[in-house]
Every structure is written in structure tokens, then in C-alpha cells.
């Protein structure tokens, strides 16, 4: 039997939150590329903890966003999109996604309602059949699809996998997200919180800074720069005047890619630096002096050290 939740159908937890036993747990978000996982994590956490772009496979490793809702601390694990891997980096990303799912208390499968169960979604459903954790289905972008089609999509997915609950949401405008959070509070086990109350991510600030610059790189260059690029924070210096000096390197594989990253007269790298510096200053609440360098490192995608920098295991063979 399929249990579907939409807006305002979930009873609220009554009583004072601080009088209730605390709950905590890990929720892994999995799904095809560009299903909206990072957008949803940022929405549920209430702050930006995972980068977002229109490009597929933006998330490369598991990112954790930490939300407090009522008496529960919910740790969301934003995993890379699951797709058919072609390169070594692809294999590492997909392995990371399934590894995140296996480590979680609950698995949330996010499906783009417009794309439905085509392609990678079918393969993910097959892979979920033998996963023992409790599973919920979230149909995203419901404002773009007729309700009749949403119900058909939910039924088709539930025929393949026994989901404990199905939610219809919009990660962009927040529709259905409150009901989702209420359900997670009720479902996660009782126990102490894993992180301090004011912590929203477990990502080191140096790595978060690199992720933000990588996002600006994607947003600025669109389809011009292939995925053979990687950003590392090489220097982080707190200065006496209260500012911070950050030096980052954008690694590419060929000179032609370096020219794209720099842009004509350096216009591209200047725009990327300005956008990244602005966001970093807002996050850190202090002035930021950001210096970006572009270096060619052939076949960096075969370098185990680069994988460790991204938080990925290096696949052998």
C-alpha cells in the first residue's frame, strides 16, 4: 500500500520540544544527477552547505548538512548523482553515493518529476531493492507536473521498491518540505545529537571554500569547461586586521582549458574570483582576499592525491 504525503497532512508533534527526548540520525539523499538533491539539502538545512549548478554531476563527494527540527538533529548526506560511470572519477563518485546510502539510518530517493523514471532512475530503483534501511520517495519539482501524472509516477516507483512513505515536494519553493521534516523527526531514533547545535556542516572550511569557487567556475563557464577541473585551497591565512587571505588553485588538464578558465584578458577568472570572494565574505563574516591561480596538471583525474582532496576513494583498475 502506497502512503503519500502532501502539504499539511502530517500531524504536528505536540508539547514543548525541549521536553521531548532528543532524536538524531543520518538521512542519505540519493538520486539521478540534477534531481535537485543539493537544492533540497540547502532548503532543509536553511543555509547553503552544498553547491548547486545547472551542470550534472556537480556534487562529487558526500556532503553533510545538519538541520535542527523540533527535538531532532537531522544529518543530511548529499551524495553525488548516480549514473552510469565512464571514467575513474565517475566510478569514485557513484561508489561514494552508494556508500553514503549504506551508512545512513534512512534513505531518501529524490526523483525529478518531469523526467520520471527514465534512464538512471530505473537502475537506482533496482539497486535499492536489496538495501535494508527504511526508504522514502520524494518527487521533486511537483509544480511542473500535473497531479494525475505525479500519482502515476509515485505508483510506478512504489511497484518497484517498497517505500515507507512518498512525499511530493518542491525543493525550490519549499512546498511539502515541512511535512517531510516532521516525518523525519518521528522516524529517526532517540539519541543524543552528533554535532553542536549551531553547526550546519561537517565540511572543513578550506574545502567548503574550494567548493564555492568550483560552483562559480561552473556557473561562469557553463559548457565551455569540461569536468576535468578541480579546485584546491592551498593557503589560508588569518590576518591581524581581521581579514583572511585565501589562495586557491584551479587544476585543468590542458593548456586550452587553462585559456578558457582565464578568459579573454583574464575576464573569466576575475569574475569567478569576485563572485567567490563575495560569498565567502558573507559566510565567514569577515573580509576575504582571494587569489586564484590556474595550473595545468595532465591526467589529474588519475592522481590518488586529488581524489583524497575531494573526499573520494581512489578506484583501482
Swiss-Prot record:
Where are the stretches annotated G2? 57-61
What are the start and end residues of every segment in region (G4)?
140-143
Q: Kindly state one GO CC term assigned in the UniProt record.
A: plasma membrane
**Keyword Nucleus listed:** no
**PROSITE patterns referenced in this protein's UniProt entry, alphabetically:** G_ERA, KH_TYPE_2
Bilayer disposition of the protein: Peripheral membrane protein
User: Residue ranges of region G5?
Assistant: 169-171
Q: Which CDD domains match?
A: Era, KH-II_Era
Q: Which Pfam families match?
A: KH_2, MMR_HSR1
Could you tell me which residues belong to the region G3?
78-81
Which domain of life, per UniProt? Bacteria
Residue span, KH type-2 domain: 221-298
Q: Which residues form the Era-type G domain?
A: 23-190
Keyword tags: Cell inner membrane, Cell membrane, Cytoplasm, GTP-binding, Membrane, Nucleotide-binding, Ribosome biogenesis, RNA-binding, rRNA-binding
Q: Which GO terms describe its molecular function?
A: GTP binding; GTPase activity; ribosomal small subunit binding; small ribosomal subunit rRNA binding
**Subunit details:** Monomer.
Q: Which family does it belong to?
A: Belongs to the TRAFAC class TrmE-Era-EngA-EngB-Septin-like GTPase superfamily. Era GTPase family.
Report the protein name in the record: GTPase Era
* Gene that this sequence comes from: era
